[in-house]
Amino acid sequence: MDEDGERRVRTKRSCSPESSDNGSGDEVDWISDLPEALIVLVLLNLPTKDVIKTSVLSTKWRNIWRYVPRLDLDNRHFTEFDSLASFIDRFMRSNRKVNKFKLRCGSDLDGDVDLATCSWKWIYMAIKRKVQHIDVTWPGVRIYPEIYNCESLVSLKLSEVTLTKPEFVSLPSLKVLVLDWVEFYNEFAFDMLMSGCPVLESFTLCRRYLDNVRVLRVISQSLLSFNYYGSSSKSFRDDLVVILDAPKLEKLKLSHQLTASFIIENLSSLVEADIDIEFNFCRGKKFDPDDLPKREMIRNFLVGLSRVKTMTIAACTLEVIYDYSRCEPLPLFPNLSFFSVEFYQKRWEILPFFFKSCSNLKSLVLESDYFPRKRTSIISEPRCLLSSLEYVKIEFALDKGKMELVRYLLENSPILKKLTLSLDHSSRKKSCVILRELITIPRCSTSCRVIVL
């Protein structure tokens, strides 16, 4: 065993201060003296390869690894797949209970064992042993319908696999679902999966291209957190639709520029949203003011987010909102207290309009990689008194154009307590100039502190 591995499983100390003083060298292995059940509990936190290493510590440790109800293996730790398969077979036969089944397999497996048969057999055996957590990464392997019916399963994580057609889905205990680059049988199969998880609380979906689902319906009465990601592959179809109906949802993350439509039915409990989408306005596609169905979809999307308290928006999303705002007024966000936004080009023009919709905004974070060189845009827009704003953090290089934004915030925020400027290396060289200009800017708030980092 390597030194680091031994340090994790063995702790020694002197029997007593007297023996230490006498230099007797007598030591006690305190971990080995623990009850076997407690040792097994400790070993549950280690990968299986490290658990097996403990068998060389002493006679007592020789077979303890066999009673650890957790399998966590990576095929890279085996010279060939046949050896991996043989080990898993022995492990599953010797354990009546398996709490967690975690397996990482590459796509270049050598051996005579049939992969599909192995995946079916091992998952079936884990289910029979009342498994609570399944975590499988196995490019291209087919996961058979047994996975859809497991009363004990609490969390399910599948990566790069293909799900077969379900006849029936019943996952009454499943609370966490993570699907990463998974291919579904069809849309109806995905709908069945969602409807068969009555207590699901967290769902993360990282979509692959051509996953056989055009309209993705995430409908759940129990869901608290939903994270949605998509690939930027050119093979992605351009008519993808996401329908979200989750009245208990509190946290939402959307990140995929190529999904054309997001339809929000009910997000009445939403607290936090992180939005990085542009409704497929990319690869040459532009916002069309005359496309009334698209405008209605965007309007309903923004209204669906209107109860949120904390929101982060990417530059591409702000671009769409800016184009939309020139056609229709933005909805109100009466609960929004924290707003973080990344923007570029001239899209900071939207800020005064957006501020009008946020009557209770208290904290604002602004990030940008690019600003227009001209001192324009915001000064010509209608002035909006930021009556609730207390904290502002600006994270980008400062120049004359960006100082106009700082001026706008200082002059229109009557209860602002702190404005923090986080400068990059180039801006720090001009810090004296920046500080002199800051001093000359009138402040609407008499108690505002300006901090330059």
UniProtKB/Swiss-Prot annotation:
FBD domain span: 373-423
Chain positions of LRR repeats: 155-179, 210-235, 246-269, 305-329, 358-381
Disordered: annotated segments: 1-28
Signal peptide: none
UniProt keyword Repeat present: yes
Keywords: Leucine-rich repeat, Repeat
Matching PANTHER family: F-BOX/RNI SUPERFAMILY PROTEIN-RELATED, FBD DOMAIN-CONTAINING PROTEIN
Full protein name: Putative F-box/FBD/LRR-repeat protein At1g66290
Domain (F-box) ranges: 28-81
A Pfam family of this chain: FBD
Domain of life: Eukaryota
InterPro entries to which the protein is assigned, alphabetical: F-box-like_dom_sf, F-box_AtFBL13-like, F-box_dom, FBD, FBL13/AtMIF1-like, LRR_dom_sf, LRR_FXL15/At3g58940/PEG3-like
Segments of skewed composition (Polar residues): 14-23
